[in-house]
Curated annotation (Swiss-Prot):
GO BP annotation list: arginine catabolic process to glutamate; arginine catabolic process to succinate
Disulfide bonds: none
Keyword Cell membrane assigned: no
Nucleotide-binding among keywords: no
Record-linked InterPro entries: AstB_sf, SuccinylArg_d-Hdrlase_AstB
Pathway assignment: Amino-acid degradation; L-arginine degradation via AST pathway; L-glutamate and succinate from L-arginine: step 2/5
Gene behind the chain: astB
Source domain of life: Bacteria
Organism: Escherichia coli O81 (strain ED1a)
GO MF annotations in UniProt: N-succinylarginine dihydrolase activity
Annotated protein name in UniProt: N-succinylarginine dihydrolase
EC number: 3.5.3.23
Amino acid sequence: MNAWEVNFDGLVGLTHHYAGLSFGNEASTRHRFQVSNPRLAAKQGLLKMKKLADAGFPQAVIPPHERPFIPVLRQLGFSGSDEQVLEKVARQAPHWLSSVSSASPMWVANAATIAPSADTLDGKVHLTVANLNNKFHRSLEAPVTESLLKAIFNDEEKFSVHSALPQVALLGDEGAANHNRLGGHYGEPGMQLFVYGREEGNDTRPSRYPARQTREASEAVARLNQVNPQQVIFAQQNPDVIDQGVFHNDVIAVSNRQVLFCHQQAFARQSQLLANLRARVNGFMAIEVPATQVSVSDAVSTYLFNSQLLSRDDGSMVLVLPQECREHAGVWRYLNELLAADNPISELKVFDLRESMANGGGPACLRLRVVLTEEERRAVNPAVMMNDTLFNALNDWVDRYYRDRLTAADLADPQLLREGREALDTLTQLLDLGSVYPFQREGGGNG
């Protein structure tokens, strides 16, 4: 059956700031306390969506979350009106204010793990929300992510959206950033590759930085998504590269159809994994980048592998890269050699995503891949699909509500909270989502 990969990109939120919240993510730590530009960040993301849509790659948008997230501050013991809560936390414990104001939901590669209908036992598309258990600021995302996905994939005959796994370290799940799918045409059954960093009873694990994904979580997600057990492989990421800042697999590998583009040090027991994939995926091609050409350190600093690998109708592929790759002489030299070599990659598209990159999120972090048949695509909420009208409407919306300068101190401004709620109220109408945010459901309006 014919099917297409639709990229659902996260829209950067109004409180995008640099707080260094993500230990193990070296870009996040390095840019801590810099001044951010939320308006520019949102526009950089929108431009990527629009240019890819114009190039023929189906594209949609997932909205940001409500931030600062006052309900969690109340759970932490701050009381009074919303304004009083903000004032108290800013004075007494500003680190909590930064955490509940994080715009991290924009990295929707961590929103959920997807199983296309061709891979599932019941023939539905399955989406399991990630619990993002390893980082407090990200663990707050799951309930609203679930509401948003249910508003976008709202036809229960075609889509099953599952709640996140329990919030315990044993079941730490980071979503599609640790998941690849390999195979032929998108509509054919594919091989799902789940990548984990640690498992109970296995001493092979990183020592410097945390392994965020567990094998136990990956196995549970595969069960929830009803993936045919014959179409699943579980593989461990190389713990040494996690200790070098590869906090998700999508920082060291990316797949599309029959191609796996990865660093030669990406996986534990890599040669064994690739042999398994060759045996189980027709036409499988591994493009392994040698450390002699691109070091792990350079891969992390340029986000070479946090790229998007997209298929054209003729079978050729486009690699979507951040500008940092072009600015690194060694990485750019390698990429031009890759273009000239015998493989399906025939074009490089480069985007300026500096605002997101400075927090450790490249092109692949910003998108959630969902393979859909034509019938399934028609069942998606049409208001989120990117086109000229939506692009212009969202740019106008960003111009109206977003600030062009934000520091950690600005997060205590009650006006920022009001602006954010008014903006999201408007956005839910624009995207025909209904009341998906807690402040809307509580009848709090814009106050």
